[in-house]
From Swiss-Prot:
GO molecular function: 2 iron, 2 sulfur cluster binding; cysteine desulfurase activity; metal ion binding; pyridoxal phosphate binding
Class in the EC hierarchy, top level: transferase
Amino acids binding pyridoxal 5'-phosphate: 72-73, 152, 180, 200-202, 238
Quaternary structure and partners: Homodimer. Forms a heterotetramer with IscU, interacts with other sulfur acceptors.
Identification of the protein by name: Cysteine desulfurase IscS
Gene name of this polypeptide: iscS
Subcellular location: Cytoplasm
Keyword terms, alphabetized: 2Fe-2S, Cytoplasm, Iron, Iron-sulfur, Metal-binding, Pyridoxal phosphate, Transferase
Amino acid sequence: MNKQVYMDYSATTYTKPEVLEEMLPFFTENFGNPSSLYSFSDKTKKAVNLARERVSKALNAEKNEIFFTSGGSEADNWALKGIAYANKKKGNHIITTKIEHHAILHTAQFLEKEGFKVTYLPVDEEGFVSVEDIKNAITDETILVSVMFANNEIGTIEPIKEIGELCKEKNIYFHTDAVQAIGHVDIDVKDMNIDLLSMSAHKFYGPKGVGALYIKNGVKIQNLIHGGGQERGKRASTEDTAGIVGLGKAIELAMENMPEENEKLSNLRGRLIRGIEARIPEVKLNGPKDMSRRLPNNVNFSFIGIEGETLLLDLDMNGIFGSTGSACASASLDPSHVLLSIGLPHETAHGSLRLSLGAKNTEEDIDYVLEVLPKIIKQRREMSPLWEDYMKNKEEK
């Protein structure tokens, strides 16, 4: 296996050299606890403050509205549990969608066991939630609406501004999981009426294990982690200075590079989509067909008569790394909840492949995938009873 092509940037990214360079002194030289009062900790305090400033600038938020966490999952947990527990006297109803990340869905299911009511809204065949459906689901008990900014599997960019306006009008808190959106979509929490927003550094070329939750001033929220008085009394635990510095630098670079990077990724995405559709019969592009409403790095196809896990292994043997819509990492054989939610039959959802592009991908990478993938699909279909049945049924029709 000579050539290696990584196309799973929605799962994680590498840490950019400029980010690592800024982080390194905080492991060995400037290691003071940012909460300590002596002058030795001044550099760490300043570094954490600078990172907070960089994040707030990227979102058009205030500095004191940014709270650092251990990642996107913690931020999502904090947003849902924190709002639910702090506002239960006002109401006990939460609205979300069926295609959220498991950090939202599993937290919502946990809250249901705690006595909260959760409405899981459907989406259309491209993954869009209807603002009208949200409006119709709101009751006197509704305290929170949580809708992801952009979907991690099929790249759908949701109508966040319209949802924000509705929530403001109804006086309901609005949270968005923006883990996939940072660096790809313009975000303005004021203009979009967002009350809470989650992010994770490792999705935009920062380190793993650090994220942030934006909490608009005045939002009533309970702490998730209790202990010391860090993060202005809202989130206990000694600050991960190096990680926070990395997040701050990474988001600054993501904002600077966004127009150029998005153009490059959109062009590569177009080349890949057109190439697959031209070379492989009976394929279905999952997610929005209008590319302006889709993440610029997202490609997700279903291949009739193919098992996703087998396809991944075949690609791996050829040095291509992507992901599947199947829950191959768990004991479950159920396909992706996202693909089922957009109406795909089980067997179609099982044969799905997500290729998510990033900074190091080139046209040569795309062409290599277009050389290898059709051969694998052809070979696997020749051995597939699913494909045989499908073609037989098609001929009969």
